[in-house]
């Protein structure tokens, strides 16, 4: 951090354009509180800038990629939230995504797609024959494995195609590519890594698993068959089942059982992704959907979480829209159970704050404490929309009056009125927090 760091933040505050994008690395052990205060003040303006990155976790991510510590210190955010080593790291980030909502659906339908009615995945057994929750969880894990095997195979094909298409302009920005006359596409960088494999639907997975565990197996409030019938009907005529699903414990509320399940599932996912290697190295996991949670949701029917068919999946590591009811602190505690350092492509947390919070007298101090808590808990990233929901709804109805309204979508900022309606609806539906606690 130096004088230019403050100047860049001030320029962003004064100009308020959606490009160029702006991210900050913050290290509690190294950077002064005055810098954190300036970050908080700019965030409160509501432009979506800057995106905030926990420097210590960023370094850990580079170490987990095999980068030596003396160079990992020089990491930088690139793209949306991906971790990069400028001029030295070859890795196609966010190369392929896999759908965790589909994994749950396929486990409930023995490999079939609810939307298309075809066998879309492998058969993992009739769920009505499962005698324990563990059998159901294993079926979901096998569906995730199946998805990942296909995803990685597709990534390898893309690598083979890319190997035949050199990129000399890009290669000129890599020291070793120039020194050794070896193109970036051929692995000419100093550090060559497997491509990014990114999960979409974190909260959909966890909320669905815990709902089945509680409602079907632990408390026996509903049979598996009745749950399946309710999902087939998109809960129409099964409002009692919908109510039970909605009231089941939810990711993002610091529930101990949900937190433990989150840690277990995402250690499993990281382990499995890292078990695959390309010609450039082991594959690298991430959780950064950009806005892919919206089109991915169009492929997934109703889920045990209570989510209705074809609606957007949860974005990044954020809770499902409207289900985080215990405040921003509880969200952080839940998210901290994901091993962020192992998802070394990057992880993305969107937070929507009401203008009521921004206008409160202690908001800057409270936001600074929130960001410190994020760092202490080992969460990698967060970014904010500071706006009230009614303004977004009005902008959707009367776009001509809101041409300059900036929002943070995922790893990028955009003019709200230029977004598709589905993405606008997704942003509107996010929980709006009026306080930190």
What does each model-found stretch correspond to?
Residues 1-437:
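Conserved catalytic cores of very large enzyme subunits
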């Amino acid at each position: 951090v130096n004088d230019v760091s403050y100047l860049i933040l001030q320029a962003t505050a004064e100009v308020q354009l959606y490009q160029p994008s702006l991210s900050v690395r913050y290290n509690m052990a190294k950077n002064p509180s005055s810098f954190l205060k300036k970050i908080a003040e700019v965030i409160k303006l509501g432009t979506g800038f800057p995106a905030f990155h926990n420097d210590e976790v960023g370094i850990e991510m580079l170490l987990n990629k095999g980068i030596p510590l003396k160079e990992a210190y020089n990491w930088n955010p690139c793209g949306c939230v991906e971790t990069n080593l400028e001029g030295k790291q070859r890795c196609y980030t966010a190369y392929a995504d896999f759908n965790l909502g589909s994994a749950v659906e396929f486990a409930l339908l023995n490999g079939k797609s609810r939307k298309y009615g075809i066998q879309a995945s492998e058969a993992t057994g009739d769920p009505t024959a499962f005698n324990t929750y563990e059998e159901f969880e294993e079926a979901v894990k096998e569906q995730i494995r199946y998805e990942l095997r296909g995803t990685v195979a597709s990534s390898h094909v893309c690598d083979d195609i890319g190997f035949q298409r050199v990129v000399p302009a890009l290669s000129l920005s890599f020291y070793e590519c120039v020194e050794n006359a070896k193109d970036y596409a051929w692995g000419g960088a100093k550090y060559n890594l497997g491509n990014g494999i990114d999960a979409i639907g974190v909260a959909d997975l966890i909320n669905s698993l815990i709902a089945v565990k509680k409602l079907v197996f632990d408390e026996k409030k509903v049979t598996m068959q009745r749950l399946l019938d309710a999902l087939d009907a998109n809960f129409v005529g099964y409002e009692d089942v919908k109510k039970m699903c909605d009231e089941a414990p939810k990711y993002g509320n610091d529930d101990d059982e949900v937190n433990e399940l989150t840690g277990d599932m995402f250690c499993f996912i990281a382990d499995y992704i890292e078990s695959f290697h390309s010609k450039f190295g082991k594959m690298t996991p991430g959780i950064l959907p950009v806005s892919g949670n919206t089109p991915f949701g169009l492929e997934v029917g109703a889920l045990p979480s209570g989510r209705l068919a074809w609606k957007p999946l949860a974005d990044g590591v954020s809770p499902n829209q409207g289900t985080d009811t215990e405040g921003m602190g509880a969200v952080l505690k839940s998210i901290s159970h994901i091993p962020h350092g192992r998802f070394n492509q990057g992880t993305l947390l969107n937070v929507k704050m009401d203008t009521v919070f921004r206008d409160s007298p202690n908001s800057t101090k409270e936001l600074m404490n929130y960001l410190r808590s994020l760092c202490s808990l080992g969460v990698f990233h967060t970014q904010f929309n500071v706006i009230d929901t009614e303004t977004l709804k009005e902008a959707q109805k009367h776009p001509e009056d809101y041409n300059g309204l900036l929002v943070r979508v995922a790893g990028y900022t955009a003019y709200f009125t230029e977004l598709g309606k589905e993405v606008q609806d997704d942003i509107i539906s996010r929980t709006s927090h009026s306080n930190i606690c």
